[in-house]
Each structure stands twice: as structure tokens, then as C-alpha cells.
A protein has these predicted regions:
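Extracellular/periplasm-exposed beta-strand and loop segments of Gram-negative cell-envelope proteins
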Residues: 3-30, 53-89, 114-147, 172-206, ...
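Transmembrane beta-strands of outer-membrane beta-barrel proteins
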Residues: 1, 48-52, 108-114, 168-170, ...
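Alpha-helical membrane segments in multi-pass integral membrane proteins
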Residues: 164-174
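Repeated loop/turn-to-beta-strand initiation elements of outer-membrane beta-barrel proteins
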Residues: 43-47, 102-104, 161-165, 211, ...
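Outer-membrane beta-barrel domain signature, strongest for Gram-negative TonB-dependent receptors
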Residues: 34-41, 46-52, 105-106, 218, ...
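Acidic, polar low-complexity intrinsically disordered regions
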Residues: 50-58, 91-97, 106-108
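Residues on the lipid-exposed face of transmembrane beta-strands in outer-membrane beta-barrel proteins
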Residues: 35-39, 90-96, 111-113, 149-157, ...
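Internal, conserved structured core segments that host functional sites
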Residues: 94-121
Length: 267
């Protein structure tokens, strides 16, 4: 499940109010397919890569607007559906493998680069404050990209003849960019209503194990956790009359928890 949120201030100096608008996507359920590979070349170069694509099938969205500082005097809130959209994750890394204990323990320092996309949708509008209830036609989009290098450590332990345990930890630096289309806002331009730009960081941790069925085939389970956030950045709004306005993007936060079941082939 994934969660993502962002909030903006009333102006570029984080004033009046310091949180003007806040969007949250909570408990996004995602079906994902993923492929990846690891190879050691000439016993000195370790290469790894992965590609994953997922479909959002369920989730919740909240859109709140405030007149007072620190999320006070909330004058508008809608609670909406977020059961559509997709995600994309690409990562690759290279390192030098160290093998200890007759090869049972493997430790590999890594450097790499990753790219992550989220196409988040907002539908099924329901106005909570003021309590007007459901409203038709909501079909807004918020599309994100996190790109940048990372450093990490890959761990492997062959605990038995058929059982192998593994783990990874990565620290990422990211250029964050996002574009939104707020389809019901007639005063905004379409399909690009506003954009976000910021610098961010992230940490990715995964642990798992594989059980060998044959010499070339194993079953594996992988548990992964990610947490990303940005520094303050820029929110630039594009209006229907061609004008623009810039304010402070206070922060963007994204966390993800996943369980992956799969098969592994050895060549």
C-alpha cells in the first residue's frame, strides 16, 4: 500500500496561511508485476536492475483548504475516490562483491540510479466541508516523477542448501517533478493546471528469501519499505487566461509497503 501527500503555502514566503491547501492519497492498493536480475561479471563487477509496473485498484483522497495558519479554519474539504491510476519503478546499480565464509555471506556496496512515476487520479467527488455531499464530473490527475542517484548495500546469506536470505538498503537523492490537471477548475489551464518542482531524498529497505526448487529455479518472497520526502520547492499555477502564479510547495511525502511473491531463474 502507498500513501502520498503534499501541501502548499499561501505565498512563496510560507505565509498567510502557512498551509493553504493539502492533498492526501491514503491506502492505495496496487497490483504490480516486476522483473529484475542480478549478475556478477568476472567475479569483480556486480550488476543489478529491476522494472516494475502497477495498477492502482483502490484508495482514498482528501483535498483540504485552510484560511488560518497550521491547518486551522478549514473552509473546504472533499473526500474522494482514488481507485484508478498506475505506477512505474525502474532502478539499476553496479558494485563490487565481497564473499565471506566460503561464499556463504555476500556483501556488495552499490551505486545506482532510479526513476519512479505515479499517475494518481481523483474521482467520485464528495464535499464534506461545507456538507454538500456528492458532486459529479470529478476526474483530476496528479502525475509525479522521482529521479536520481543512490548508494546502497546488498546482503546475501546462504543459510542452508536450498534456502537463501537477502536484504538491501538504499539511500536516494531525487529530483521531484509533478504536473496536475484539476479538471473542474474552470479558472485553471488544462491539461496542465499546476506543476511542482523540489529536491528530495528517500530510503528503500527490502528483505526476503528464496527456496531452491531445482538448480535453476527458486521461489522467493520479498518485503520492501520505502519512505521519500522533499525539501520546500515551487508550486506554479497556470490559469485559463494565460497568466501564472507561484507559491511555496512546503513538502511532498511518499511511503510504500509491498509484499512480492515470485520465481527466480538462474542462467
Amino acid at each position: 500500500a502507498d500513501n502520498l501527500d503534499f501541501n502548499i503555502a499561501g505565498d512563496i514566503s510560507e505565509c498567510c496561511p502557512n498551509v493553504l491547501s493539502e492533498l492526501t492519497w491514503n491506502d492505495l492498493k496496487i497490483y504490480q508485476v516486476k522483473t529484475g536480475g542480478k549478475v556478477i561479471v568476472n567475479k569483480i563487477i556486480y550488476l543489478q536492475g529491476s522494472l516494475g509496473y502497477g495498477w492502482i485498484i483502490d484508495g482514498e483522497n482528501q483535498d483540504s483548504d485552510f484560511l488560518g495558519n497550521n491547518r486551522t479554519i478549514e473552509f473546504s474539504r472533499s473526500n474522494n475516490s482514488a481507485d484508478n491510476g498506475n505506477v512505474l519503478d525502474v532502478s539499476f546499480g553496479v558494485g563490487y562483491p565481497f564473499r565471506l565464509g566460503s561464499g556463504q555471506l555476500g556483501i556488495t556496496p552499490l551505486v545506482g540510479y532510479s526513476h519512479h512515476e505515479q499517475d494518481l487520479r481523483i474521482t467520485g467527488g464528495f464535499q464534506t466541508i461545507p456538507p454538500f455531499g456528492p458532486f459529479p464530473g470529478l476526474d483530476s490527475a496528479y502525475e509525479t516523477q522521482w529521479n536520481g542517484p543512490w548508494v546502497g548495500l546488498d546482503l546475501l546469506f546462504k543459510s542452508a542448501k536450498k534456502l537463501t536470505l537477502f536484504g538491501d538498503i538504499e539511500y536516494h537523492w531525487a529530483d521531484y517533478e509533478a504536473e496536475a490537471d484539476w479538471n473542474l477548475r474552470t479558472d485553471f489551464a488544462h491539461p496542465k493546471s499546476f506543476e511542482h518542482i523540489a529536491d528530495g531524498t528517500g530510503i528503500v529497505i527490502s528483505v526476503g528469501g528464496s527456496f531452491a526448487i531445482t538448480n535453476r529455479l527458486s521461489m522467493n518472497i520479498d518485503l520492501a519499505f520505502q519512505r521519500w520526502s522533499t525539501d520546500p520547492g515551487i508550486d506554479k499555477t497556470f490559469f485559463a487566461d494565460g497568466s501564472t502564479a507561484t507559491t511555496r510547495l512546503n513538502e511532498v511525502n511518499w511511503d510504500s509497503r509491498e509484499i512480492m511473491l515470485g520465481v527466480m531463474f538462474y542462467f
